[in-house]
């Protein structure tokens, strides 16, 4: 009986520890409120001419942080002022626009290998020693017109490296990680007529 109780308590402790991990260090979580993957039915050459596709490419407000603890945690709120922030081109890698450091490694991990954690303390010579998990906070706006009423609206990201949270008008829509595949979210219930605020928080590394 004592062994069974001990085993139960041990499993409970492990489960509680897993629950405390952020989504981007939790191997159980790879997406929240994402649409199922599906085939792309619109050819890239036709997207420009499609009236039902609105591109959000362009200049977004942006702030880069060396690690999650230094990010502006409330930036997604509607009353958060980003007027003093820089602007960044989307799509685009922030490392090629003056933020952080480009790293290419097909052998070594760019962070301390301690799965599923990506923020464990690495050797002092690692770039990630002083930049545990660089985080980008992005904000833009888009318009919803009356003719969109009664239509389902989806937010489509063609690739984000490597994990992100998404908010629309201050409400959290979902989470995704998988930098080499698209991510889609149904934002129909989050939008309103007129100007809408989109906030995206991107983490450079995830489990």
Feature-to-residue mapping (PLM):
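Bacterial Sec-dependent N-terminal signal peptides
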Residues: 1-20
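Short glycine/proline-rich turn/loop motifs
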Residues: 115-127
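Accessory beta-strand-rich segments of carbohydrate-active enzymes
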Residues: 28-31, 42, 46-47, 61-65, ...
């Amino acid at each position: 009986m004592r062994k069974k109780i001990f085993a139960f308590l041990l499993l409970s402790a492990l489960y509680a520890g897993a629950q405390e991990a952020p989504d981007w260090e939790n191997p159980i979580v790879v997406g929240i409120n994402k649409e199922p993957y599906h085939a792309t039915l619109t050819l890239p050459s036709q997207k420009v001419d499609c009236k039902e596709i609105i591109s959000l490419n362009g200049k977004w407000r942006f702030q880069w942080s060396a690690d999650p603890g230094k990010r502006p945690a409330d930036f997604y709120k509607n009353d958060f002022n980003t007027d003093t922030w820089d602007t960044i081109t989307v799509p685009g890698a922030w490392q090629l626009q003056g933020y952080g450091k480009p790293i290419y490694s097909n052998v070594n991990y760019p962070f301390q290998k301690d799965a599923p954690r990506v923020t464990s303390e690495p050797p002092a010579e690692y770039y990630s020693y002083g930049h545990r998990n660089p985080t980008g906070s992005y904000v833009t706006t888009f318009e919803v017109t009356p003719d969109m009423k009664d239509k389902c609206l989806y937010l489509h990201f063609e690739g984000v490296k490597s994990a992100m949270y998404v908010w629309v008008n201050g409400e959290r829509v979902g989470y995704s990680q998988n930098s080499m595949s698209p991510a889609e979210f149904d934002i129909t219930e989050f939008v309103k007529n007129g100007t809408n605020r989109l906030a995206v928080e991107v983490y450079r590394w995830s489990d």
